Amino acid sequence: MAIYWIVSYSILVFCFFELAMINQASEAKTKILINYFFLIGVFALILFAGIRGPDSGMDDSQYVGFFHDFSRQTGMTGYQAVANIYRYENFFMVLAWVASCFTHESYFFLLFISFIAVSTNAWVYKKYSPLILCSLCLYSAHLFINKDMNQIRFGLCSAFAIAFICSLVARNYLLALLFIVLSTQSHSTGYTIVMIIPFFFIRERKYLPLVLVIASIPLGIIGGKKLFLDSLGIVPVLGERAASYSGTNFDTTSPVFGLANLKNIAFIGAFTLYYFRKGIMKEDRFVYILLIAYSIGAAVRITFSDFSIFGGRVGNLFLHTEPLLFAFLMLRIRNLLLNFFMLFSITTYYLAYNTILSAQSIMGYSVAPLFRIFS
């Protein structure tokens, strides 16, 4: 597991330079250096996830086996006949078909998916984050490990979902439409991203994000599964998929006041009180929507504490806004030592959580035999 710490801490070193130059960020030389470090980090993450081998991600064997069979079956019976056999979403199946036109090697397929997922997240950070290296560092310590190193369909779904939210706030509606289609057709959880849409039409309220997450606590104590599972059927595909987990080994509970939930509540409260201490200005709308999305994720996670496979999956879709939120928060603080301490602390927390305290996504790390140059 040490390799994950090395990767994230390596990016963290570059973050110190970005934070130190926060007041000179608009200068050409500073931009060039930061972009150069950013590209190195993105390339490293793509390769790190793309060349992984056995005993890395928990779900890897599922996708390696899938592509091994799929790439050979399509050559004999055609795409449509084979696609009907599998339960995977349309866009993911199309990606598998495109990859199968060039190779039958499953580990090349993982590299292909890694390139798309990491590049999409990188595009979002490059376009919308004020501190791109800091966002990339947080992503590498948590979302990258949880999603792109394991749940690759959900990783694609989440990357497209955050791109959808950002594009919608920027009023790039055609791009937003493209991203929501790609998200829902990468993983059925993507349909839940529509929960953010009503908040585009509701007047900004300073404490609304905090109200959302606090209101979810009594629902979580009662149990979201008991209250809402039957209603999930109104969501295409997702309701059926969620119901299929009920009563299985995936149907587990998590504490309402667990470490992750308490961290989310504390972050929402602290962010609200500090970032919006003078109220929500017109230029704060983008950050406000990101915080609303984060609050929805935290609230869903708490509400469905009695059905953690659903609460965790849907919650994590919205919690994908965290690397952007932290970047905006540090930009407003503008204190080098405090910012670096915050970034170091949250990066360390996530690395410890994902590799030691709750290693649910990864088993370790190895390089696939296909990519072992020196063995």
Curated annotation (Swiss-Prot):
It is a multi-pass membrane protein. GO terms for biological process: polysaccharide biosynthetic process. It holds the Pfam family EpsG. InterPro entries: EpsG-like. Keywords: Cell membrane, Exopolysaccharide synthesis, Membrane, Transmembrane, Transmembrane helix, Virulence. One of its GO terms (cellular component) is plasma membrane. Pathway: Glycan metabolism; exopolysaccharide biosynthesis. The chain crosses the membrane at residues 2-22, 31-51, 93-113, 162-182, 208-228, 256-276, 287-307, 309-329, 337-357. It is found in: Cell membrane. Involved in the biosynthesis of amylovoran which functions as a virulence factor. This is Amylovoran biosynthesis protein AmsC. It comes from Erwinia amylovora (Fire blight bacteria). The lineage of its organism: Bacteria, Pseudomonadati, Pseudomonadota, Gammaproteobacteria, Enterobacterales. The gene is amsC.
